[in-house]
Amino acid sequence: MVLLGSLSRGEATAWSDIDIERWVESGTPALGTVPRFLDGRLLAISTNTVDDVFAQLELPDQALWAVPAYRAKRVLVDRGGDAAKMAAIVARFSWEALRPKADRFVSLTTAKSAEFVLKIRAAGERRDEWAALHAAGSLIGRCARIMSVARGTFITTENEYYRVVCEASGERWAGAFREAFALDGAYDAFAQADAACRLFAETARLVDDRLAAEARDVVRRTLALVHA
């Protein structure tokens, strides 16, 4: 059992929750726990199998979050020695070892994200604001994930996620990201959705050298349809 989050890092505020992760052996029922307040703080306990916990380190999009979290963890109980084993692994973790998997993730996720560009185009033709906003939100989130993996940007806390991805991706991408969230100017739903498409185009430009031929073709044809 380990303590994660701002309390383990020594950065807690009055609003920070108590984030506890319970590791169990494979096959053990993962019982959900309803959060509750403890001494004025929200207590959240999650349960994961040991196999699933260590598997995060083999998945690029999850390792970016897991490595900083487990480096800063505070061990509460470690009867089986798994927390000590994790500490040793994350201490010597190398992003370069995951680079091939990261490139495949970027290529596949970029190609799959093209679907939401087409959904935005369809929503615009129907003047369906809710469909446009849903597709835009989905596309924005995927673009951030693509760039975080493409740049190998470790995330210490959700509070800094967007900031560090924008810093790693450059001013042009960060500007497109802000526009997609309607931070720089007033937009209606369709203008915001169009801005999300521009963010996707900029994302695709930045990761073009990571795209497999099939993925690059999907992206190229999608953007050609949108701008036709």
Residue map of PLM features:
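Catalytic metal-binding acidic patch
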Residues: 1-49
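Short aromatic-enriched loop/helix-cap "lid" or pocket-rim segments at secondary-structure transitions
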Residues: 14-15, 57-58, 159-161
